[in-house]
Design a protein with these regions (language model features):
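N-terminal beta-strand motif that seeds the catalytic metal site of vicinal oxygen chelate
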Residues: 1-22, 40, 83-86, 90, ...
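Vicinal oxygen chelate
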Residues: 1-4, 99-143
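Core segments of cupin and vicinal oxygen chelate
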Residues: 13-66
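Short, conserved charged micro-motifs
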Residues: 20, 93-98
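A short, acidic/glycine-rich surface segment
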Residues: 35, 66-73, 112, 116, ...
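Exposed loop/turn and edge beta-strand positions of beta-sandwich/beta-sheet ligand-binding modules
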Residues: 43-45, 84, 123
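Helix-adjacent hinge/juxtasegments
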Residues: 59-89
């Protein structure tokens, strides 16, 4: 792989309460919150959390979906729900730590899957969980 190709910049997740969602992603998933103070002060429309140095998850309130029609007609009716899940690839240690944190916070997780195909080939292990707003995530590791 080269560094000059397309990269995933961000994914917008529809959430009921952006501050609560940021708390979930920080405390339970272990992601760094961004722009929380600016959101609380009304300076930005939504906060985000950092997935890695190149990718963030935007935590947009549900009521913003109505505004999607002005940008792309018909988008408000489907915004967010055609997505099946988002997969996050981690090291084996981070994978195990995430599963432990989720369980400690009472978040249901699926049994392990083995050998599921993804961007880097077949994963050693993977599992699924959902956030408080119903967004589904897969966690996996290849090492």
């Amino acid at each position: 792989m080269t560094n000059s190709g397309p990269r995933l910049d961000h994914v917008v997740l529809w959430v009921r309460d952006p501050v609560a969602a940021a708390g979930f992603y920080e405390k339970t998933v272990g992601l760094e919150p961004l722009r929380l103070d600016e959101f609380a002060a009304g300076k930005v429309s939504f906060p985000s959390v950092r997935l890695n140095e190149e990718t963030i998850l935007d935590l947009a309130p549900y009521d913003m979906a109505r505004g999607m029609n002005s940008m792309l007609p018909g988008a408000a009716d489907s915004a967010g729900h055609p997505v099946n899940h988002i997969c996050v690839s981690l090291s084996a240690a981070a994978f195990d730590a995430l599963r432990t944190r989720l369980q400690e916070h009472g978040v249901p997780v699926t049994d392990f899957s083995h050998g599921a195909y993804g961007a880097r080939g077949n994963a050693k292990r993977s599992f699924y969980f959902h956030d408080p707003d119903g967004n589904v995530f897969e966690a996996r590791h290849y090492d």
